[in-house]
Amino acid sequence: MPKPTKGPRLGGSSSHQKALLANLATALFEHGRIKTTEPKARALRPYAEKLITHAKKGTLHNRREVMKKIRDKDIVHVLFAEIGPFYSDRNGGYTRIIKVENRKGDNAPMAVIELVREKTVTSEANRARRADAAQKVAAAAAPQAAVEPEVTEGPSADEAEAVAETPIADEAQVEVEGTESVSEAEADEAKADSEDEAK
């Protein structure tokens, strides 16, 4: 059973709203971007995105479903020949709403709704970023695994007695030598990372 949409009818009846959305969608597909009031733009967005989803499928049935709403055959042809295939690898989010200054006469909130024309590479970029991060973590973990067993081993009893008998100056020298070896290990890791990135 058909039920009316919730909320206001954009200043008219349900038939007026259907005609209004069809005309706005026709203008959007023809020009790529239109300026309208913000409530109309928000109502147009799901309407237009459903039509683009039909165009992506490209079957005769989908073309007839779109023709029920958009009566201009030229616009339907553009929708199925150009716009639908352009978004073939994108799942939703075909339009963008940008708020602009209010209308001068009645101070109505205005917005520009446009088709998103940029190709998204976020999934490929995220995949590459994750692979680089995994390589860096693996490269950092491998030298640390080799260094950690040396660090975890405690000094032997003879070495402990020798360290206890040495003056404080010798202890400071040992600490400095330890930090130098750590900085050398970090330099080696940085060099290995730069070689991996060069590959």
From Swiss-Prot:
Segments for region (Disordered): 138-199
Gene Ontology CC entries for this record: cytosolic large ribosomal subunit
Q: Where is the composition biased (Basic and acidic residues)?
A: 188-199
Name a single GO biological process.
translation
Acidic residues: compositionally biased ranges: 172-187
InterPro entries documented for this protein: Ribosomal_bL17, Ribosomal_bL17_CS, Ribosomal_bL17_sf
Q: Which Gene3D superfamilies match?
A: Ribosomal protein L17
The Swiss-Prot or TrEMBL record annotates one GO molecular function as: structural constituent of ribosome
A Pfam cross-reference name:
Ribosomal_L17
Q: Cite the HAMAP family for this sequence.
A: Ribosomal_bL17
Similarity annotation? Belongs to the bacterial ribosomal protein bL17 family.
Query: How does this chain assemble?
Result: Part of the 50S ribosomal subunit. Contacts protein L32.
The identity of this protein, by name, is Large ribosomal subunit protein bL17
Organism in which the protein naturally occurs: Mycolicibacterium gilvum (strain PYR-GCK) (Mycobacterium gilvum (strain PYR-GCK))
- Which taxonomic lineage is given here? Bacteria, Bacillati, Actinomycetota, Actinomycetes, Mycobacteriales
What gene name is given for the protein in this entry? rplQ
